[in-house]
């Protein structure tokens, strides 16, 4: 019987880390500081070094990592924050949670990241209507690579907008030598288990080079705490990282650079196999970029047929994302630029198994099934 294929094989990674991981977990348990223990500060230090930033603020999850930045910037009612429509709901959700208005922007068809021309059209629309104040842009580093900040950053500077980079899927990626997490006025990531760098529960982090912002973020994540535990200088949230998760992440970070290389090798084998087919659009990494390949996403003319064939052969797949946020029940009342690309690719994208421990025989099985099905 053919062995089942894992979409993301976290157990293979756990076996690789083995006793080192188990010891780190037990050390955290026996240390007795189970929330914000010393491992959290050590993780923040190592993440700052990895991302090339001055400050890392660990928190409870990737959604909070975005939320606390918007709170620190006093973004709220009457403010507009520009987000891509082709992404996970958290990107727009946090904007609505602070009382601001998400304004949806289309993406580029070949990279799935924010389209600068659509962003400019959305900014012009908001200015012309005069009902909202444009405050920030939140590009998402979708599927593992950064948005094209070489174009987006000048737009933000020209318009006086803050940039909060959502690197939940792209943490570890590079753009012209700059690491995702170290780009923008602030950036965030998620340590949800399925992410390229994930823990064994929920976790997140925010990154910045702004000293004052970092101080405010540290306060907000612990109930708006001041210099004393029971001094509350602002309205905050409860978003502390568990010590055990920090211990796990320290061990995972030690192999993360190598895992990025292994993911790249898998992606290149996929690309080389699919490039010859005129019925498959393989993902493109922008010039000067390196992806962490959080997902390997292709486009095909008949997704349902391919999914059925994959399932019949015991190969998992996923659709990220089947509906643009601007068409979702909870978000369709918010303003949006025209989003023809997102509307179209939601019907054609499909993601294949991708992880560092995907062996060549399994890759070949996936490749052969895809090529035969399309």
Give names to the regions the model predicted.
Residues 11, 40-45, 50-54, 106, ...:
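PLP-dependent aminotransferase class I/II
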Residues 16, 75, 263:
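Pyridoxal 5′-phosphate
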Residues 32-80, 94, 104-105, 129, ...:
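Phosphate-binding glycine-rich loop
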């Amino acid at each position: 019987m053919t062995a089942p294929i894992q979409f993301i094989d976290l157990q293979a990674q756990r076996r690789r880390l083995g006793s080192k991981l188990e010891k780190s977990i037990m050390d955290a348990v026996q240390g007795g500081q189970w929330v914000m223990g010393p491992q959290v500060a050590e993780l923040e230090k190592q993440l700052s070094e990895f991302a090339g930033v001055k400050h890392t603020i660990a928190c409870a999850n990737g959604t909070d990592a975005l939320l606390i930045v918007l709170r620190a910037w006093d973004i709220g009612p009457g403010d507009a924050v520009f987000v891509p429509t082709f992404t996970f709901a958290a990107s727009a959700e946090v904007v609505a949670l602070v009382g601001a208005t998400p304004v949806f922007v289309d993406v580029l068809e070949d990279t799935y990241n924010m389209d600068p021309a659509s962003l400019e059209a959305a900014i012009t629309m908001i200015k012309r209507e005069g009902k909202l104040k444009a405050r920030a842009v939140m590009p998402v580093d979708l599927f593992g690579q950064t948005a094209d900040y070489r174009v987006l950053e000048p737009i933000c500077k020209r318009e006086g907008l803050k940039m909060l980079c959502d690197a939940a899927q792209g943490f570890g990626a590079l753009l012209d030598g700059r690491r995702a997490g170290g780009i923008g006025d602030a950036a965030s990531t998620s340590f949800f288990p399925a992410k390229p760098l994930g823990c064994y529960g929920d976790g997140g982090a925010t990154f910045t080079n702004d000293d004052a912002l970092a101080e405010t973020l540290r306060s907000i994540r612990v109930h708006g705490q001041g210099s004393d535990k029971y001094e509350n200088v602002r309205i905050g949230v409860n978003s502390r990282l568990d010590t055990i998760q920090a211990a796990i992440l320290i061990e995972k970070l030690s192999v993360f650079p190598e895992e990025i290389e292994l993911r790249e090798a898998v992606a290149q084998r996929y690309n080389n196999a699919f490039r010859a087919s005129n019925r498959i659009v393989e993902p493109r990494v922008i010039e000067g970029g390196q992806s962490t390949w959080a997902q390997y996403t292709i486009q095909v003319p008949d997704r349902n047929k391919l999914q059925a064939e994959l399932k019949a052969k015991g190969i998992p797949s996923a659709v990220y994302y089947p509906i643009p946020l601007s068409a979702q029940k909870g978000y369709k009342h918010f303003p949006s630029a025209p989003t023809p690309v997102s509307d179209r690719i939601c019907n054609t994208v499909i993601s294949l198994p991708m992880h560092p421990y995907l062996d060549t025989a399994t890759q070949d099985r996936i490749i052969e099934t895809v090529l035969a099905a399309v």
